[in-house]
Amino acid sequence: MTLLALGINHKTAPVSLRERVTFSPDTLDQALDSLLAQPMVQGGVVLSTCNRTELYLSVEEQDNLQEALIRWLCDYHNLNEDDLRNSLYWHQDNDAVSHLMRVASGLDSLVLGEPQILGQVKKAFADSQKGHLNASALERMFQKSFSVAKRVRTETDIGASAVSVAFAACTLARQIFESLSTVTVLLVGAGETIELVARHLREHKVQKMIIANRTRERAQALADEVGAEVISLSDIDARLQDADIIISSTASPLPIIGKGMVERALKSRRNQPMLLVDIAVPRDVEPEVGKLANAYLYSVDDLQSIISHNLVQRQAAAVEAETIVEQEASEFMAWLRAQGASETIREYRSQSEQIRDELTTKALSALQQGGDAQAILQDLAWKLTNRLIHAPTKSLQQAARDGDDERLNILRDSLGLE
């Protein structure tokens, strides 16, 4: 059994590729079924966010394993293998465990130490449990990663400063608009990222917010908290002209805001500028919008420069966190190896007990037939001894014939010989 982590993220692939490799919530069950149907896969978890798509797998080692999994991923998304291969990373066993722990702790995020990723990893794990069989080692790896993430956040200052994609989007808005108290902000979506954006905006005295979402109930709960108006996605075209700032983060597989929609809004605004921050993957705003005069479009990748300015104080904490991850990953792999030994011990004990039971049954039968008790006990002891030492004796003889002193010493140690 081998543990694997493979995928792409914001460091290895541009948004144009990442959006083609995402797994939407609507198709996740189907994707998991397809993945677990692969003969080498024993268990799997799919993590798909704005900044990464990753597969965490428990697999049986086989020839061309990497090729088979890349082929599955490309076939599922109708991708050219060469396009994906150049951006794909592949981690195995200890490296896979360390990678997941780093991801869950926010150490591999676009925003170092951001807390949202832990919730996303937990959701990915929970989704994989719904009607899908998972390998126990994979489950244990995820549970351990959750506790490591908690330890990192508790024992270091990795989360001391409020830095996130949501925070960066608000920082960008403050850089472009002198005061946010007089602007109207349209938020598209009502997920966790938009919730954070809305709270940041409220803290910076934004008075007018509009939340557009597919389901009104979820949006209304957020609107009640921050004092916003709620509209449906179909109302965006009519209301876009009211917005000075648009920040969008949905799970839609297709763009929600098109070039024509923005052109009409700009015309109604008499070309007053609009800031559009698209932090969704796949993108919510057609890239062509950025070519329009007075429409200033930023994608999630464009936020990197803003985010970089807020990371200095987290670097020392990240070093401490990496030490924790290294230690915990090593302990997990020791546990995993011990599980393999435990299975061997169980098999050895079971085999010994079978030999004991077989010979004891024969001895009792001989006693019941009136045989000499002393002779029967001596015979039992002799046969039991020979049966138990037969396999180790053969191994010792073979090691001696091979001149394998290291194996001989291991066998001597295993048998408790001085």
Curated annotation (Swiss-Prot):
NADP(+) binds at G189, A190, G191, E192, T193, I194. CDD domains: NAD_bind_Glutamyl_tRNA_reduct (cd05213). Pathway: Porphyrin-containing compound metabolism; protoporphyrin-IX biosynthesis; 5-aminolevulinate from L-glutamyl-tRNA(Glu): step 1/2. It catalyses: (S)-4-amino-5-oxopentanoate + tRNA(Glu) + NADP(+) = L-glutamyl-tRNA(Glu) + NADPH + H(+). GO terms for biological process: protoporphyrinogen IX biosynthetic process from glutamate. The keyword NADP applies. Possesses an unusual extended V-shaped dimeric structure with each monomer consisting of three distinct domains arranged along a curved 'spinal' alpha-helix. The N-terminal catalytic domain specifically recognizes the glutamate moiety of the substrate. The second domain is the NADPH-binding domain, and the third C-terminal domain is responsible for dimerization. Catalyzes the NADPH-dependent reduction of glutamyl-tRNA(Glu) to glutamate 1-semialdehyde (GSA). Homodimer. This is Glutamyl-tRNA reductase. It comes from Salmonella choleraesuis (strain SC-B67).
